[in-house]
Swiss-Prot record:
SUPFAM superfamilies: Elongation factor Ts (EF-Ts), dimerisation domain, UBA-like
Region (Involved in Mg(2+) ion dislocation from EF-Tu), start-end ranges: 82-85
Protein name (record): Elongation factor Ts
Family label: Belongs to the EF-Ts family.
A molecular function (GO) term: translation elongation factor activity
Major localisation: cytoplasm
Organism: Christiangramia forsetii (strain DSM 17595 / CGMCC 1.15422 / KT0803) (Gramella forsetii)
PANTHER family cross-referenced by the UniProt entry: ELONGATION FACTOR TS (PTHR11741), ELONGATION FACTOR TS, MITOCHONDRIAL (PTHR11741:SF0)
Keywords recorded for this protein, A-Z: Cytoplasm, Elongation factor, Protein biosynthesis
Length: 274
């Protein structure tokens, strides 16, 4: 039997994140071969992943990253089973590492095949499922490109938002962050009325009409009043028309124009866990 040193165990632990005893067992089984021990730990991860495939992984960390020139951003969620794991510093660090890699890709499928320290992201997730003992997977994958992109991550990494602005100007970074905070807090259904799907519009009109009938309003007045209520729905639930949370006397669209008269919010992405 090969003699396994503490230094070898520690090296394997740093490389894989596995526990000390698991690393020692893998090195013993691999007769001291470092690469062989890594492979054994990966196989263990695959077995654990297969057993936990049907488990709910609604906890985790939502992370937003923006590239160096603020023209592209990405949000990923690294999902797990428990809040205990989601708050672990190593888990959050891994989520941030994944997000940095994700900036280079436009789809979740491409990202999962990307290299992560010598193995694919997908294989790393399987490995970590074995190491942590919980189902670990990538949930959301969103990208946004615009003349200027900013971000905001809410405390606890449960909500992440990207905001795209129409141009890069002095104050754009703060404006994008403030609008992202707005989206995090108020959860708008769309950027503006054009972005609200027809199903939602039809539902809101029907709810309004049903309420008006219960109030005894004449049938010939329902359409006009319902349209007024729909406009109120747009004002309350679309990002650019919402009252700005830091100054409710102006809308979000009005707020960004205080930064630059021609500045507009052109897109946003929001991911929330739980």
């Amino acid at each position: 039997m090969a003699k396994i040193t503490a230094a070898e165990v520690n090296k394997l632990r740093k490389a894989t994140g596995a526990g000390m005893m698991d690393c020692k067992k893998a090195l013993v089984e691999a007769e001291g071969d470092f690469d062989g021990a890594i492979e054994l730990l990966r196989k263990k991860g695959q077995k654990v992943a297969a057993k936990r495939a049907d488990r709910d992984s609604s906890e985790g960390a939502a992370i937003a990253q923006v590239n160096g020139d603020n023209t592209k951003g990405v949000i990923i969620s690294l999902n797990c089973e428990t809040d205990f794991v989601a708050k672990n510093d190593d888990f959050i660090k891994m989520a941030n590492n994944f997000a940095e890699i994700a900036l280079n890709y436009s789809s979740k499928e491409e990202f999962l095949k990307a290299d992560y320290k010598g193995i694919s992201v997908e294989d790393k997730l399987t490995e970590q499922t074995g190491v942590i003992g919980e189902k670990i997977e990538i949930g959301a994958f969103r990208t946004l490109e615009a003349p200027f992109v900013g971000s905001y991550i809410h405390a606890g990494n449960k909500i992440a938002v990207l905001t795209g602005l129409s141009k890069s100007v002095d104050g754009a970074e703060e404006a994008a962050k403030n609008v992202s905070m707005q989206a995090a807090a108020m959860n708008p259904v769309a950027l503006n009325e054009e972005g609200v799907d027809q199903g939602t519009i039809d539902k809101e009109i029907e709810i309004a009409k049903d309420t008006l009938r219960e109030e005894g309003k004449p049938e010939n007045m329902l359409d006009k009043i319902a349209q007024g209520k729909l406009q109120r729905f747009f004002k309350d639930n679309t990002l650019v028309h919402q009252a700005y949370i830091k100054d409710n006397k102006q809308s979000v669209a009005d707020y960004v124009k205080t930064v630059d008269g021609a500045l507009e919010v052109v897109a946003f992405e929001r991911v929330a866990l739980g």
